[in-house]
Regions:
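Helix-to-loop junction immediately C-terminal to a conserved catalytic motif
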Residues: 16
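Conserved catalytic loops of ABC-family nucleotide-binding domains
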Residues: 150-159
Length: 211
């Protein structure tokens, strides 16, 4: 819940409370996040950064980070939603396949999908995707989002994105220009009422293709 303006960098940081808003408040279930203990807040949020970090170990140990007791079935379900099951299954050892420090032995898109799967295993109340689909091709992006909706139906999903197709079906879209909010609404509402958003849509796709 946003009550006053804050810049894009602050918007990304404020939900997990890496920084506090300078005015207004962010509420989770009606409670100001500044009134929550940081560790309690973090337990409710699954953060997936644009450039995620993978630890030296196995695919399974990376996915179990934060939930050590997750079963193999839970891991494969999360991998399936994240569109990562096929490439993990093709790796020698599957869940036991080795991951180099920082994930240097997998591609950028594979790192993003593994990080998304890691967050999905936690099943948090809030998912914060910080441009987490940027390394994915459009088809993979679309399949992942379609699978994410039923999987995370009990959670709030917040997506920071540059690509219109990634957020076109969101319940609410907040448009930022130079770090300032210039529009809030659904895709169709913003195409009709927000020149900045309409220009972005026109520059990326035809309105008909996205709607």
């Amino acid at each position: 819940h946003r009550q006053h303006r804050f810049r894009q960098d602050h918007a990304r940081q404020s939900h997990p409370r890496l920084a506090d808003v300078t005015s207004g408040a962010i509420l989770v279930d009606g409670v100001d996040i500044r009134d929550l203990q940081p560790d309690m807040l973090w337990q409710r949020i699954g953060l997936i950064p644009q450039k995620p970090y993978l630890f030296s170990g196995t695919v399974g140990s990376n996915l179990r980070y934060g939930k050590p007791d997750a079963t193999d079935d839970e891991l494969w379900e999360a991998l399936s939603v994240a569109q990562a099951a096929d490439f993990v299954a093709s790796m020698p050892g599957g869940l036991d396949a080795r991951i180099a420090q920082g994930g240097s032995n997998v591609s950028g898109g594979q790192r993003q999908r593994l990080a998304i799967a890691r967050a999905l295993v936690l099943k948090p109340e809030i998912y914060l995707f910080d441009d987490s689909f940027s390394a994915l091709d459009l088809a993979t992006d679309a399949r992942l989002r379609a699978a994410l909706v039923p999987y995370a139906s009990r959670s709030t999903i917040i997506i920071v994105a540059q690509r219109v197709s990634t957020i076109a079906n969101a319940d609410q879209i907040l448009v930022l220009e130079d770090g300032e909010p210039v529009g809030l609404g659904t895709h169709d509402e913003l195409v009709a009422t927000c020149p900045t958003y309409a220009e972005i849509v026109a520059s990326q796709y035809s309105v008909e293709a996205v709607a």
